[in-house]
Amino acid sequence: MKRKTGFFFDERCFWHSTGLHAVTLPVGEWVQPPAGGGHAESPETKRRMKNLMDVSGLTPQLALRSAAPASLEDLRRIHPDSYLERFKAISDNGGGMLGKEAPLGPGSYEIACLSAGLACAAVEAVLKGELDNAYSLSRPPGHHCLPDQSMGFCFLANIPIAVERAKAQLGLGKVAIIDWDVHHGNGTQHIYLQRDDVLTISLHQDGCFPPGYAGEDDRGVGAGEGYNINIPLLAGAGDDSWRYALETIVIPALARFEPELIIIACGYDANAMDPLARMQLHSDSFRAMTEQVQQAADRLCGGKLVMVHEGGYAESYVPFCGLAVMEALSGIRTEVQDPLLEFIQQQQPRATFAQFQRQAIDRLAQQFGLL
């Protein structure tokens, strides 16, 4: 079914600079300058995704929009002034390191506000019925950012900022946030850990980032108990494991919660080519996962689904995964063929691995009363 799908994008988000790094290591001492590329969180994966959308003919069939930056009032609903002032000071003084794995350059504060503003505008357009669903190509990402601490390439909590603005201005009630970035959505979890009006679900590689974290036992605190679900998957997990986790835990949890809006923190770093993880997803995995959640949104909240870009660091492959997601969101199939699809499908884990992972997923589903 063809939908009116929004794509929120601004060239200036590509101008956020992460400085001179070799993947994630600052150049200096024993770390040599890279022969090519640079920091993993470069603009190229996002730019190339948009490029492929353009040449495929998909972009003109979408509602292409930009947005105003998130306001100081928007930011203050999540972040204290002391943090925002420190962030802006470093940005104004040419950049530096704001937190763990959080390098920034000149002007990064204003660009981060724009990144959050794109997410806010996408949420508002869907809630107001201007669009059926939407995608925000936000950069820098946001799902690792704590209220007073940046980390993991994230400086502002894009999705919580958008959610809280919609609650304040549009009366939004219950929201479900699904994070399928391969790294745990620790920032979003922290912000909503004590709340029962926001369901947070993170699917991630066990122990990847933050290093050593799995999170099965972190299920919320106080009023929020039971409203935070972590699904750690073993390194090497592929299409079967991720889609089974959605089918067995995520979709039933959504049905039980009955949200008014579903947001996906959409990272592509669980793809088989990513340098910062060890998973085995391909473009059709992301296509099918998007379709699964969109179908749930159709049943539960009038189809209201917003996706906000997070990670994904394989410049050659993220564009194919991102295009597959946009095709699934919009209901428009292009002529583009994924040149690595068959190759990655042949690399999928053997049945014994998939069965072992399914058993772990079943146990977790039982603990949450979903089986």
Spans of model-derived segments:
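Cationic, histidine-enriched alpha-helical/coil surfaces that engage anionic ligands
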Residues: L62-G99
